[in-house]
Curated annotation (Swiss-Prot):
Family to which the UniProt record says this protein belongs: Belongs to the bacterial ribosomal protein bL28 family.
Natural source organism: Rhodopseudomonas palustris (strain ATCC BAA-98 / CGA009)
One of the record's GO cellular component terms: cytosolic large ribosomal subunit
Other remarks on this protein: The initiator methionine may be removed.
Entries under Gene3D superfamilies matching the protein: Ribosomal protein L28/L24
GO biological process: translation
Matches recorded under NCBIfam families: L28 (TIGR00009)
Protein name: Large ribosomal subunit protein bL28
SUPFAM superfamilies on file: L28p-like
């Protein structure tokens, strides 16, 4: 399992640990990933994803998983998230739009 967010594509970065005597040694900065179960309103089911806490905050800010995925670019999503995005878009396109009366 890679250490990469399935929604934002955040991954590990490489940097230096710097000692008091300014000796630099390589280290990895890992993203803060959590396993989360999202509820898709459109699909009507639960979806488990491994996302960063920053992405979790972004999903909440945009109004849920469906809204986040529809607005996100496919290039930065994981294959699982792209499949979800397409399923949500297909389901939303198939539903008739309720006319305001």
């Amino acid at each position: 399992m890679s250490r990469r967010c399935e929604l934002t594509a955040k991954g590990a970065q490489v940097g230096h640990k710097v000692s008091h005597s300014n000796i630099k040694t390589k280290r990895r900065f890992l993203p803060n990933l959590v396993n989360v179960t999202f509820l898709s309103d459109t699909l009507g089911r639960a979806v488990r994803l491994r996302v960063s806490t920053n992405a979790l905050k972004s999903v909440d800010h945009r109004g849920g998983l469906d809204a986040y995925l529809l607005k996100a670019r496919e290039a930065e999503l994981s294959p699982k998230a792209v499949e979800l995005k397409r399923a949500i878009a297909k389901k939303m396109a198939g539903e008739p739009v309720a006319a305001a009366s």
